[in-house]
Amino acid sequence: MKIKLVIFYTFLAVATISCKKNGTGGENTIAAFPKHHGVSIPNATVYIKYGATELPGQNASDFDDAKTAVVDGSSAAHAHFEGLLKGDYYIYSVGFDSTVNEVVSGGIAVKIKSKSGEQDVEVPMTE
């Protein structure tokens, strides 16, 4: 009987550890493109929350990582979050749209379904 319990608890521990989802340790990348009415927002701060499908808050401490959206060659401003696992993520961005002289912000839920690859995501922002 004792051996069966040891085997059961060992299996349970291995199953729990191997089911890790969301966060870092994988081979996925999210390329987040912050945009306000289709206009790219360079230098916007782009935040990511692992395991979230809704906005967790608007403070930097509510998120797991942050990057600055940069213009790379002729591409629109974007930020890369690399090394992600399959799972749910929430991307939130804050920046300044010089065409309307306003601070803009917004976010979007992202689901990664594959083991590896890059997912381009437009982050819609409003005043």
Can you annotate each of these PLM segments?
Residues 76-83:
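Short, surface-exposed beta-strand/beta-hairpin micro-motifs centered on an aromatic residue
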Residues 15-18:
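C-terminal motif of bacterial Sec signal peptides marking the signal peptidase cleavage site
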Residues 28-36:
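A short, amphipathic beta-strand motif
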Residues 96-127:
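Structured interaction patches on ligand/partner-binding surfaces of diverse proteins
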Residues 37-64:
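Short, ordered, surface-exposed loop/turn motifs in non-cytosolic proteins
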Residues 87-93:
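A short tyrosine-centered beta-strand micro-motif
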Residues 20-22:
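Bacterial signal peptide processing site
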Residues 35, 94-96:
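Beta-strand-rich extracellular modules
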